[in-house]
Regions:
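Bacterial N-terminal signal peptides
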Residues: 14-25
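Second-shell loop/turn segments in exported
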Residues: 33-36, 76-84, 102-106, 114-118, ...
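Short, conserved catalytic-motif segment at the N-terminal edge
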Residues: 57-83
Length: 294
């Protein structure tokens, strides 16, 4: 099966306006920050936000960036520290389901395909629970993943279904787990890798490309966001296009979680999403120094 790349086209005017306003209000100069290593750039950026009170002492962050052309990890901050997973756990549920399909224990037909699309593209919690039920529920699903894919779920904690209100706070994962999953996925080492990539490329909101002003139109993205009143995150693969006609894939994973439930969900999640976009901007500029990108 061939992978069909699905570029996500941003709303250019809104993206430019939003990015400009955020830059003026909260972001340090990215052009001035690209001289050091990417890890130190990200660390410095987050520390500057903390110093201004834009990220509070109740919030924790974790980041991982990997160049898939060379396999080099370019940034690792709190890589193995468990953070709230939110919907970023859903690609792992897809993996467990497709493992059972490959084993001949489940069928992947029109109904299950629709549930899978709703789970990944729309983050539908009812479909998420349906998928998890097929693999035996939270405990059995975690056991399956730990048995067959131990290197992908070292810090994964799967203990609950997703309630209708979406307030599931006890499932955990680390940015290291997400990056390991995405690396294996890109290398086609997982069952139904092409289908999982297709699902993660379906059009939808993301925090890695859309409204990230330094990333050019036509960059392909495969991702899954996670959002609760205690977590804002995104895990994804971006495929940058080079001026030489080659493609340069890389992973960006960012998670910001709060130890307390925030009261103003809308504004909190929007501002944290913009922080992740700025880290994605930093990453693209760093990759542009490594390769002849557009």
């Amino acid at each position: 099966m061939c992978i069909v790349l699905h570029p996500r086209i941003p709303h250019f005017f809104l993206a430019t306006l939003t990015a400009a306003l955020f830059t003026l209000s909260s972001a340090p100069s990215i052009r001035a920050a690209v001289d050091g290593s990417l890890g130190s750039q990200i660390d410095g950026y987050i520390k500057s936000l903390r110093a201004r009170g834009s990220i509070s002492g109740n919030e924790r962050t974790a980041w991982l960036v990997r160049d898939l052309t060379t396999g080099t990890t370019l940034a690792s901050i709190n890589e193995n520290s468990p953070r709230q997973a939110a919907s970023m756990i859903k690609p792992f549920l897809a993996l467990a389901f497709f493992h059972q399909v490959k084993a001949g224990k489940l069928l992947y037909g029109p109904s299950s395909r629709r549930h899978m699309e709703l789970m990944i593209q729309k983050s539908d919690n009812g479909s998420t629970n349906w998928v998890m039920q097929q693999t035996g529920g939270p405990t059995a699903t975690k056991a399956l993943l730990a048995r067959h894919y131990p290197s992908l779920c070292r810090n994964l904690r799967l203990v609950e279904y997703i309630p209708s209100n979406g307030r599931a706070y006890r499932n955990l994962g680390s940015v290291g787990d997400y990056a390991s999953f995405l690396t294996a996925l890109w290398k086609k080492q997982l069952p139904y890798s092409d289908e999982i990539l297709r699902l993660m490329a379906l059009p939808g909101p993301d925090r890695l490309y859309t409204k990230a002003r330094h990333i050019p139109s036509g960059t392909h993205v495969y991702d899954k966001t996670g959002s609760t009143a205690m977590c804002c995150g995104d895990m994804g693969i971006l495929v940058a296009q080079g001026t030489n006609g080659r493609s340069y894939p890389y992973i960006v994973v960012g998670v910001i979680d709060s130890v307390v439930r925030v009261s103003s969900y809308g504004s909190w999640i929007s501002r944290r999403a913009d922080v992740i976009r700025e880290v994605s901007n930093l990453t693209y500029l760093h990759m542009k120094k490594r390769y002849p990108l557009r």
